[in-house]
Swiss-Prot record:
Residues 1-234 are annotated as: 2-C-methyl-D-erythritol 4-phosphate cytidylyltransferase. One of its GO terms (biological process) is terpenoid biosynthetic process. It comes from the Bacteria. A divalent metal cation binds at D241, H243, H275. This is Bifunctional enzyme IspD/IspF. Its EC number is 2.7.7.60, 4.6.1.12. HAMAP family: IspD, IspDF, IspF. Bifunctional enzyme that catalyzes the formation of 4-diphosphocytidyl-2-C-methyl-D-erythritol from CTP and 2-C-methyl-D-erythritol 4-phosphate (MEP) (IspD), and catalyzes the conversion of 4-diphosphocytidyl-2-C-methyl-D-erythritol 2-phosphate (CDP-ME2P) to 2-C-methyl-D-erythritol 2,4-cyclodiphosphate (ME-CPP) with a corresponding release of cytidine 5-monophosphate (CMP) (IspF). In the N-terminal section; belongs to the IspD/TarI cytidylyltransferase family. IspD subfamily. In the C-terminal section; belongs to the IspF family. The record marks R156, K213 as: Positions MEP for the nucleophilic attack. 4-CDP-2-C-methyl-D-erythritol 2-phosphate binds at D241, V242, H243, H267, S268, D289, I290, G291, T365, T366, S367, E368, F372, R375. It comes from Rhodopseudomonas palustris (strain ATCC BAA-98 / CGA009).
Amino acid sequence: MTNSPRTAAIIVAAGRGLRAGAGGPKQYRSLAGRPVIARAMEPFCTHPGVMAVQPVTNPDDTEMFNAAVAGLNFRPAVGGGATRQASVRAGLEALAELKPDIVLIHDAARCFVTPELISRAITAAGATGAALPVVPVTDTIKQVDSSGAVDATPDRASLRIAQTPQAFRFDVILDAHRRAASGGRDDFTDDAAIAEWAGLTVSTFEGDANNMKMTTPEDFAREESRLMAALGDIRTGTGYDVHAFGEGDHVWLCGLKVPHTRGFLAHSDGDVGLHALVDAILGALADGDIGSHFPPTDPQWKGAASDKFLKYAIDRVTARGGRVANLEVTMICERPKIGPLRDAMRQRIAEITGVPVSRVAVKATTSEKLGFTGREEGIAATASATIRLPWGADGLAG
């Protein structure tokens, strides 16, 4: 069996990103609630084939960098140089003590890199020694002269757009960078160009059209909108219900018939757990409450099973193209004891709603003998619901 190559990654993050407009270096800007650099680094930090991640940053950005990537696992950042080329060389020299077989060099501004693309880069470098991801050119390209007049129309069939991570045998790209520096060449815009200059054959592999470089304000606006649309409109709601005890030998709790010394005084079956969940879901939808949909004055709901109400609330979410992400209910009572029933309650709620049981929580507490629940005069329940709706479900733009 062939051993996997020892692979390290360099994240180039020393640039100032002036074309992105005001707001500081683009790699530290928030994109849908998360810094660009954190999005760019995490796939490398968590990839099983990458043994070390070496950031290269501007020393003036240390505080921003540490805050942006907190929680990720990487080597201490090294300071970059005056050019991208100098910054990459600083990263290579920092990795020299590790002697990796393969190095991946990635721009921090490309924050949509995927684990699959990283794996392809490692494979390509292992096979050819030098490789970069590319995507086809789909637009017609015009070559112009200094006046802006069209000089030529290159055949786009032979053109490709270069991306990162670019992947190399570590020893050969380090040598190429050292030779370029000693020869006074500091004008290369990517590492594949340095490899070509050094006489290496650079192969290509399939890139990713989504692996774009965040460069302009328009890039940030477009990708912010796309990410927020994919995330969806997240809503939360809360609910509360209470029922007093009356005559009977059982109570309905979270969809279960539970033997008890008393029953509930209620128009329906009095299931406080499900009623609280219904109100939480309707609240997340801004769609009234259980009483407005199922009035206690309406005789058709006399003795009704509360699972009908909960299914109705779920259908209201589905009708708007949404889904329930999480349900939680807390029972407040002295008796009956909820602990032994917890898992069965979660399962029953999951069956009624279609929500995975892993996203259903049932908790219990007491009022420490205080109030009506402490005096065992009834049971109360609180609930919360988190739902996801598509942007525009209520007329709002994404």
